[in-house]
């Protein structure tokens, strides 16, 4: 029964969404100033999976939006005093309930990867799409998040031909020693099985 519900969620998400002018339709759009132009706008060839929660381990609040939009109040929580001046972003955030927020159009360069390299190529922000999952490295991600993530990836694969299922990686893989997300709690096999199921 669980697999049936899981598959239904996947098809529900993928049927709703399309890409129009490099933005997903039928999701929340929250524009951020934290982006710039890609050196080669058509070179979108890598998907990077991250995780984030603010404060760490707390879910379902407005603080991720505020961080990405440079509106985080350092007096709200002690943790914010060290991060509120960061200018960072991702293209997408997938929340615990599977709902999705887009901050940056896919043809623009979001500031999610930092110092990074993939297969010998540096500056992954130049050629990647960054997807944040609301979560931590020690708490399991939800079925709704996997369903939404798989649906989003399938749509991105169709829209941007340089992407492939072989070019999906974690932040930890492009910034080893510096970053550890999405962590051991992320089930790569579950994601790949869902993507492969859609191909059948």
Task: Give, region by region, the residue ranges found by the protein language model.
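N-terminal amphipathic/basic-hydrophobic helices that include classical n-h-c signal peptides
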Residues: 1-16
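N-terminal catalytic cores of peptidoglycan-degrading enzymes
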Residues: 12-122
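Basic/polar, cationic surfaces and motifs that engage anionic cell-wall
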Residues: 17-25, 122, 127, 136-200
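Conserved, mostly hydrophobic/aromatic
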Residues: 131
């Amino acid at each position: 029964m669980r697999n049936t519900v899981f598959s239904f969620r996947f098809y529900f998400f993928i049927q709703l969404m399309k890409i129009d002018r490099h933005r997903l339709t039928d999701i929340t759009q929250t524009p951020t100033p934290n982006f710039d132009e890609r050196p080669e706008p058509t070179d979108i060839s890598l998907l990077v999976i991250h995780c984030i929660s603010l404060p760490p381990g707390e879910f379902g609040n407005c603080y991720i939006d505020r961080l990405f939009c440079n509106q985080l109040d350092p007096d709200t929580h002690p943790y914010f005093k060290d991060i509120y001046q960061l200018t960072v972003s991702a293209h997408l955030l997938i929340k615990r309930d599977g709902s999705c927020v887009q901050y940056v159009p896919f043809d623009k360069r979001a500031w999610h990867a930092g110092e990074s390299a993939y297969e010998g190529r540096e500056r992954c922000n130049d050629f990647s799409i960054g997807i944040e999952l609301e979560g931590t490295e020690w708490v399991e991600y939800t079925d709704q998040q996997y369903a939404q993530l798989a649906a989003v990836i399938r749509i991105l694969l169709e829209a941007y031909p340089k992407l492939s299922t072989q070019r999906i990686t974690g932040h930890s893989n492009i910034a080893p020693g510096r970053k550890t997300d999405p962590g051991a709690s992320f089930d790569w096999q579950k994601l790949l099985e869902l993507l492969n199921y859609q191909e059948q």
